[in-house]
Amino acid sequence: MKGQILLCIYMIILFSCSVNRDDKGINVETNKNIETLAICFEIADKGFWKIPFNDYQPMKYLARKRFEQFRDQNVIQIIDTLVNKGFWLDAMVEVLLKSSPLPNAELKYELEKSTISRLSNNKEEATRLINEFLISLNKFYIDARLPDYFTENKNYFDSVNNEVRKNLPNKHFIRTMESYYGKQNDSYTLIPVPTLWHTAGLGLRIKGTSGFKVYNIFGPLIVTKDSLDFGYGYNNPDKINELTVHEFGHSFINPVTELPENRTLIDKYNYLFKPIKDKMAKQGYNNWWTCVTEHLVRLGEIRISYALGDSSRADRIRNDYINNRSFIYLTHLEKVIIDYEKNRKEFKSINAYIPILLKSFGQIDTLNYKN
């Protein structure tokens, strides 16, 4: 215990002294492109139109009631066609995030190859379909008078953003996280979308100048049938914390675990997936690569909590992840990561140390991990 306390003090001193720049904040903003897409999904047959909902979600209800009359718009038919091809909401959100603002939306940033391939193996064909989608959405934005809608509901969207802001983590969090990983990103942005299904969300990143522009798009975090309990749907500090500490952590870990040489290393130890395969699948983690990446992100959460001086949170989430979520290899990984924390002159960033973490899986005796 004494050693752990000393290490915690060491980490706090290290990170407070090693960074001279101002604290980088977390942006919270409404994205009208994505909000408009969410409205279209509410009235599309292959979206959510045929799915009833009983929980209190005022903007979801308003979208269906106000825009039902536009269900025959071309964009709704195109959305149904794209969904049939496997190009669902998450892919369309990427398109809208990487496009200029409606009603003049056109693609500004390159889409992920995996996203394009969901439409067609022919890049020209995929590009044509995406352009048709954007042109039709531009028309919908004008015909359905979305500018008026956003003006009329400005106070609601502002209140949503303020509710998120008041639940943001420690103001030193971004600085500490970047120091721990030894890397920087251009920006970090949360995009609450009150028209989306509650608990829906996804993380995206756009290549920037010194790193990535990191985004997290998410629906309401409150699940209730009572308007008094709902507020604006985002007064949930635990969920906001998860969206920042956990999801932003992926922007540092995923680009490294996605490297071909590291994928090969990960696959070498895929026999370790067997003891926890069923419990991981219940959480949506269906393969060993995803399981390892999630282990590393959660490892970072624990260690960064120590760096922020919050050992109680570190202990709490460690217990939750190991005993309730079956991330059973965290105990081993924590022992290994100490070497990284003590030798930052040698390991300038987590990129250099992840191969060591991955190779350390070979030290694990599966007989000790019958979960």
Residue positions per predicted region:
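Bacterial Sec-dependent N-terminal signal peptides
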Residues: 1-24
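N-terminal mature-domain "stem" immediately C-terminal to a signal peptide or N-terminal signal-anchor/transmembrane
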Residues: 20-109, 325-338, 342-350
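Long, mid-chain structured domain cores
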Residues: 76-174
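Active-site scaffold of zinc-dependent metalloenzymes
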Residues: 117-120, 203-238
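Auxiliary, metal-adjacent structural segments of Zn-dependent hydrolase domains
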Residues: 157-218
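Active-site recognition of the HExxH zinc-binding catalytic motif
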Residues: 238-258
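Post-HEXXH active-site segment of zinc metalloproteases
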Residues: 254-281
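Pan-zinc metallopeptidase signature
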Residues: 299-371
